[in-house]
Amino acid sequence: MAIMRMDNVLIVVDDLDAVISFFVELGMELEGKGPIEGRWVERVIGIDDVRQDVAMLRTPDGHGRLELFEYLHPDAIETEPTRPNDIGMHRVAFSVDDIDDALEIAARHGCRPLRGVATYEDIYKLTYVRGPSGILVMLAEELKTT
């Protein structure tokens, strides 16, 4: 037995449509959206009487996928958004072709860089933004060398 590939990353959100809009405008593609409930999902996630709306998004190259859950029952447990130095998984990163354009899109959704854009060794321009539902998103533009 061996892992073949990473299939997706799940993010629980408080406003599914707002999060879909944010990521689709940044360039992800919506694969599907719909309700999920029943014994099979209760068995998988270990929560009884669960009902949720789910969406699956993919990157344009088809190699990365985000699964988004908005819990209808039971209510999602709201926590403080993670900070970059919190232990555990807390951000999703995307390569973008133009970080300034990506930041304009993020701004239309009320999202701003945590501290600004930095250049790493003339290789990348990088920033973290706090997206909808408190999702920490890293945007990275690879700098072209000529």
Question: What are the language-model segments listed below?
Answer:
Residues V12-H63, R108, T127-Y128:
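Core segments of cupin and vicinal oxygen chelate
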Residues L72:
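Residues forming the ATP-binding cleft of Hanks-type serine/threonine protein kinase domains
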Residues G38-E42, D75-T79, Y120:
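A cross-kingdom feature marking solvent-exposed beta-strand/loop segments within repeated
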Residues A2, I11, K33-P35, M56, ...:
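Vicinal oxygen chelate
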Residues T79-D86:
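Non-DNA-binding regulatory cores of transcription-related proteins
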Residues M6-N8, I87-R91:
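Eukaryotic phosphotyrosine signaling hubs
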